[in-house]
Amino acid sequence: MEYANENLLSLTREFELRGCKMTRINLVCPSELTDKHLMAEYRELPRIFTYVNKHGVPNDIPERYTLGKGHVKFFCDKLDWLYSRYRSIFCELINRGFAIDKRAYSSVRDSAWVMLGYESRYRPTPEELYLNMARLCKRCKVDNVKKELSSND
């Protein structure tokens, strides 16, 4: 299991070294995300497992889903939901024809299993989904989305 934890830590090391703190965790169904958002979340979601592995679950978790400060902390006690989401993202990427490194996925999966005692039964509320969709729309470049949608027809 140490091997899996080391791989999980190395997945985020590059971002930690650069001081990047943005971690995208979306609530909408992975099939509704653009390729860019889907791949970004696939890369960034494991950071929360890494954070909990290194620091434990923080005491000051926001009560409600939030964007910006507190976004990562909100998910630290929802590892079961995150793991399920990660599996869904992985499957959606495969369905779209992406070549995904299955070893990296397995490493995250194995590390997540160690921490799955945090069972939250989290289900996003309609308001949380709306907030997430509004953020996605704000960040999307409409022309790029149109091009991606037309290429999938």
Q: What does each model-identified segment do?
A:
Residues 4-6:
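Short hydrophobic alpha-helical segments enriched in small aliphatic residues
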Residues 15, 20-153:
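Extended, charge-rich alpha-helical interface modules
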